[in-house]
C-alpha cells in the first residue's frame, strides 16, 4: 500500500482525509518503518500538504490520544507551531493566564521548546508545575483555576515512533503543523500561530474541518503570533467561513516594538519573566505583546467586540496583577493534585 501512496504523492495527487487518517493511525501503532515514514513526510512536503491531509492526520492523533473530559462551558487554546527560529519570550503561556483572568478558561496544549530557548512546558516546569498530572487533575485545574496544561507527550504517546525520523530529516514536515491541531480537549475556540505565512489560510480551513467553532491563525513578521514589529497575516474562521486579514499593532491600540525587545532566555529566566509580567511588572513591549495576543483570543471567543476592546481587557487583567495568583494556584494544584491521585491509585 505504501508504495502506491508515495507514487501518488510524487505525481502530485492529493490524499483524502480518510487516507491520511489511516496512514497516521498506522504511524501511531508503530506499523510503519522509518524508511516509509521518511518517504511519506518528504513526499507530502514536496507536494504541499492540503487542509484535508492535515485534518486527517490530526483526526488520527485526536482519536488515539489519552481521553480528556470536555467541559460544557466555553474554553479555548492558544498555541503556536514553533519553528519560527526567533527565540522570543514565551508569549502564549502568558496569554493563557491573562485570558483566564479576563474570564476565558484556556486548556493549553504544549510541549518543550521548538524554536525558542524555552517552551511552555519548560517555563511551567521551572515554576514548579507538574507537566503530567492525570487528565482528571488537569480538568479540575481548568474548572477551578481557568487554566490547564496538556503536555503533548503524555497525551500522544504514539508520536514517539516518528521522533527518530524527524530528528534525522531536520526539515519541517507535516509533523510541525500538528501540535496546535491535536489538543486532546478539542477546544471550540483557538488562536493558532504558525511559522509560515503561506500556511495561514490552510491552517484555518483545517481547524474548520476539525470542528473548531471560531479561530484565528496568525503569522507576524517571522513570528508564530501577533507581532508588534510588523503587520500580522491572519485568517479568521467564523461560522465555517475563512476570512483573510492583516493586523497592525495600531488596530489594537498598542505601540510598535522591535522584535529584539522580545528576545528570550532559558527556563529559569522565562519563569521569572512570566511571574513578573503576570504580577503587573512587565516591560512595556512584553506587556503589549501579551495583551494584543490575549486580546485576539478574547475577540475570537466573543468576549470582546473587536481586537482593540479585547486588548484593552487584556491590559486591564495584566495591570491588576491577579493573573500571577492564578499561576500560583495552577502550579500548586498540578503538583498536589497529582500526588493525591497517586495516593488514591495506590490505596484503591
Swiss-Prot record:
Role: Catalyzes the transfer of the phosphoribosyl group of 5-phosphorylribose-1-pyrophosphate (PRPP) to anthranilate to yield N-(5'-phosphoribosyl)-anthranilate (PRA).
Residues reported in the UniProt entry to bind anthranilate 1: 80, 111
SUPFAM superfamilies, alphabetized: Nucleoside phosphorylase/phosphoribosyltransferase catalytic domain, Nucleoside phosphorylase/phosphoribosyltransferase N-terminal domain
EC category name: transferase
One Gene Ontology molecular-function label: anthranilate phosphoribosyltransferase activity
Family membership noted in the UniProt record: Belongs to the anthranilate phosphoribosyltransferase family.
Gene name per UniProt: trpD
Enzyme Commission code: 2.4.2.18
Descriptive protein name: Anthranilate phosphoribosyltransferase
Annotated residues for binding of 5-phospho-alpha-D-ribose 1-diphosphate: 80, 83-84, 88, 90-93, 108-116, 120
Cofactor: binding comment: Binds 2 magnesium ions per monomer.
Binding, Mg(2+) 1: 92, 225
Keyword annotations: Amino-acid biosynthesis, Aromatic amino acid biosynthesis, Glycosyltransferase, Magnesium, Metal-binding, Transferase, Tryptophan biosynthesis
Cofactor: Mg(2+)
Residue sites binding Mg(2+) 2 per the record: 224-225
GO biological process: L-tryptophan biosynthetic process
List of residues binding anthranilate 2: 166
Pathway field: Amino-acid biosynthesis; L-tryptophan biosynthesis; L-tryptophan from chorismate: step 2/5
Keyword rRNA-binding: no
InterPro entries with a match to the protein in the record: Anthranilate_Pribosyl_Tfrase (IPR005940), Glycosyl_Trfase_fam3 (IPR000312), Glycosyl_Trfase_fam3_N_dom (IPR017459), Glycosyl_Trfase_fam3_N_dom_sf (IPR036320), Nuc_phospho_transferase (IPR035902)
Catalytic reaction(s) noted: N-(5-phospho-beta-D-ribosyl)anthranilate + diphosphate = 5-phospho-alpha-D-ribose 1-diphosphate + anthranilate
Subunit structure: Homodimer.
GO cellular component terms, semicolon-separated: cytosol
Species assigned in the record: Sorangium cellulosum (strain So ce56) (Polyangium cellulosum (strain So ce56))
